[in-house]
Amino acid sequence: AFGLLMAAVAVWTFMDWVEAGCSHKEQGFLWVRNRFFTKKAWICRNVDTAILLGLFLGLTAFWNGAALIGGLLILAGLAVFSDGKLDYVICAGLAVLFSELQSKIFVSGSVMSPSFYWGFLADNKSISGVLWYLVEISGFFFVGMIVAAVFLKRGQRAVLMGCLLPMAFAFLVSLTPDINVNHKYVMISYAFVTVFWGWIVRCVFLAGKNSWKKWAGRAAAAVLC
């Protein structure tokens, strides 16, 4: 819980970086290009904050390595759409450094053995089979959020995509011989994406101006819960 809390603090803090990157007026490819090939996209915005967050995230590896990896994956997703990418690099670099130091001190032998592993626990490893497995374990939660992303604002989509990265990681990579461990990354994505789901349910609940639309919205919100 402490590791996940620190990851949440880091994600919440870097929201200002995401807002700065998504507030530019450019549209489409020009905006995407400027997120990588301009000075603002890379120059540090707050080095002290990046160092502090990197220190705290690195120390969480002692309690929960999955929370550290999940948090760094989300931050990597946010960094793509943010200004001040060097702050993300500093934060992630320090977090990995402190994590490695702890593993050298407290653990003998290799801690992780990364390998490509497609499909997580899905019996059918085809794309359709994996998507169906995702529906089976989460209902229409994750699939619904991907559809809802079409209607979100630029900054909201950026954060949502970042929050979904741990889940994508769980279906693509295995860090230990036991793939069941990857359920932690699915749960981390679930925890963060739930914030968006709660906001959508709230909007549906409050939708409608006349009586029948209000009650229809409340009924739909109850189903979505």
What would you call each of these model-derived segments?
Residues 81, 89-119, 140-154:
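Membrane-lumen/periplasm interface segments of specific transmembrane helices
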Residues 9-20, 73-80, 136-157, 200-203:
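Hydrophobic, aromatic-rich transmembrane alpha-helices
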Residues 18-22, 28-47, 69-96:
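Perimembrane helix-loop-helix junctions
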